[in-house]
Amino acid sequence: MTTIDLNCDLGESFGAYKMGNDDEILPFVSSINVACGFHAGDPAVMRQTVEKALQHNVAIGAHPGFPDLIGFGRRNMSVSASEVYDYVLYQIGALDGFVKAAGGKMQHVKPHGALYNMAVTDSEIADAIAKAIYHINPGLLLYGLANSEAFIKATEKYNITLVQEAFADRTYKQDGTLTSRTEENALIKNEDEAIKQVLQMVKEGYVESVNGGKVAVQAQTICLHGDGEKAVQFAEKIYRTFKLNGISICAPNK
C-alpha cells in the first residue's frame, strides 16, 4: 500500500488575531508545522497548538520563519547564513520547550515562506538550516521541497533525514520549483484540479508544470494550506480521496 504524510501549517494566530482553521483541519492531517513566533504565532498559541496536536495523535514540527510579522514571513530578507542559523535554532528551541512540557516529542522542522523558498536554491541558507537542526537534535527530520539539490546536499552533509515535500495547491515551474506567489497562476484554486495533481504526484511520481511539461516528483509528504476559505473542505476531500484510492496517511516517524 502507498503511504503518504499530509502536513499543514498551523498555530498562526497572534494575540487577538485569529488565523486558520486549526481545530477543523487536525482530524485530516498526520503532521503539523507550528509557527514559532517570528512570522506568526505567540507563546500561548504555540502551547495550545501543541496540546491539540497531541490529543489528535498528530506529529509536531517547528515552522521557523524570518522575523517578519507584517509580511507573514513571505518576503525575502538579505541575511547571512549565521543569522539564518540563529533564527532557526532559536525557534526550534522555543517550540521544543512546549512539546516537552506537554509530554510529547518533536518530529520535524519545516522552514516557512521566504526562508523555505530561498533555501530551495541557496545552498548556504539550506546548510544553515540543516546545521541548526543537527546541533539541537540530529534526529529531527527536515521537510523540504522535493528535488531541491540544496536541501539534499545539506541533509547529507549533516546526516539528517530529508522528507521530500510536494504541494497540493501550488503550481510548479519546469525546473521543479514552485511558481512565485507574485504570479497569478501560483495557486490552484479549483479543488478537483488540485486533487488530480496530488494523485499524479503520489501514484505516478510526476507533476505537470505551468509550461505543460512533466516534472518528476517523489513526494513523501504533501502540504495542505489551512488558512483558505475552503481549507477544511479541501483537506477532508483529499483525505477521503486518498482513502478511496488505497493510499495510507501516516507521519514519517509513526
UniProtKB/Swiss-Prot annotation:
CDD domains linked to this entry: LamB_YcsF_like
Catalytic reaction equation(s): 5-oxo-L-proline + ATP + 2 H2O = L-glutamate + ADP + phosphate + H(+)
Xref: InterPro entries: Glyco_hydro/deAcase_b/a-brl, LamB/YcsF/PxpA-like
Disulphide linkage map: none
GO biological process annotation, one example: carbohydrate metabolic process
Domain of life of the organism encoding this protein: Bacteria
EC number: 3.5.2.9
Keywords tagged on the record: ATP-binding, Hydrolase, Nucleotide-binding
Example of a GO MF term: ATP binding
One Pfam family matching this protein: LamB_YcsF
Family: Belongs to the LamB/PxpA family.
Function: Catalyzes the cleavage of 5-oxoproline to form L-glutamate coupled to the hydrolysis of ATP to ADP and inorganic phosphate.
Quaternary organization: Forms a complex composed of PxpA, PxpB and PxpC.
Name of the protein in its database record: 5-oxoprolinase subunit A
Organism of origin: Bacillus mycoides (strain KBAB4) (Bacillus weihenstephanensis)
Phylogenetic placement of the source organism: Bacteria, Bacillati, Bacillota, Bacilli, Bacillales
